[in-house]
Amino acid sequence: MPDSELKGFATADGRKLSYRKLGTGPVLVCHPGGPGLSPAYLGDLAGLWTRFTLIILNPRGTGASDRPADPHAYHFDDYTSDLEELRQHLGLEQIMLLGYSHGGVVAQVYAAARPERVRRLVLAVTTARLGPEQQAATQAAIEKRSGQPWFEDANAAGQEEDPETDDQIRDQVFRRMPFNFARFGPAEAAYLDTWRSEPINGDALRVFSEEVPSLDLRSRLANITAPTLVITGLEDYVCGPVCAAELTAAIPGAREVIVADAGHMVVVEQPLSFHDEVAAFLTS
């Protein structure tokens, strides 16, 4: 990974919002997922720094970005407000925007509300909602992994009561993490160890858990005017092909790419495919 700069600025309400800058070329703003997880999980974004100047946001309350005073201020509109402040800070009339997972939901909200500010949009392993069809696909993907040696503990973690402390949340998140991969072995476990000790923001996860049952962006997606790439892993257990198909159908002119042998962590599972598809789209 190349050297990167950790930069930041003060938001209108006095918080510090930080981002990591690396690479050279046209600016690509990336909003990571989680929520509440360290953006370190994205690594160098599949080497896209070789083609673009990456601006990888530390969303509010994660990484080096301040937590808001209100522990409930982690709604999608809060994140999109921060994204707009970042655009203004960068001095860009329009941005190329990549949203990953939860960050992809933020990117949808932003691009639908401010279509004139988005030049190109990449929606990676994300969804417009988690309705019955998406939930059925998730359950089928979970059952498909039932023969794996890690399955029993990972599945049990998802059935437990909501943890109270950030450390307890970290334990639950990482126990369940194998589901995010098409195949989970020593290499994937080693990757998790590279950011396992990063702080987790439980407030952000709790707000998301409360907000996601009513999430449904389908009526807004026609407002998106930017050329859009929807990309996910074939084996993604939470935002897989069912989610991608719905997004692609709802966003005018959107292009869909399904990456084989990849799950929710497609950016680290199949970095070459992810890099090539995203770079080709952004430079076409």
Q: What are these model-derived regions, one by one?
A:
Residues 8-72:
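Conserved HGGG/HGGXW glycine-rich cap/lid loop of the alpha/beta-hydrolase fold
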Residues 59-102, 276:
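Active-site loop/oxyanion-hole signature of alpha/beta-hydrolase fold enzymes
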Residues 224, 230-232:
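Short beta-strand/loop motif that positions the catalytic acidic residue
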Residues 254-284:
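Catalytic active-site module of serine/aspartate enzymes centered on a nucleophile-bearing elbow/loop
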Residues 150-219, 226:
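Alpha/beta-hydrolase
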Residues 93-137:
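Conserved hydrolase catalytic core segment
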Residues 121-160:
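Flexible "cap/lid" loop of the alpha/beta hydrolase fold
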Residues 235-239:
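Acidic catalytic loop of the alpha/beta-hydrolase fold
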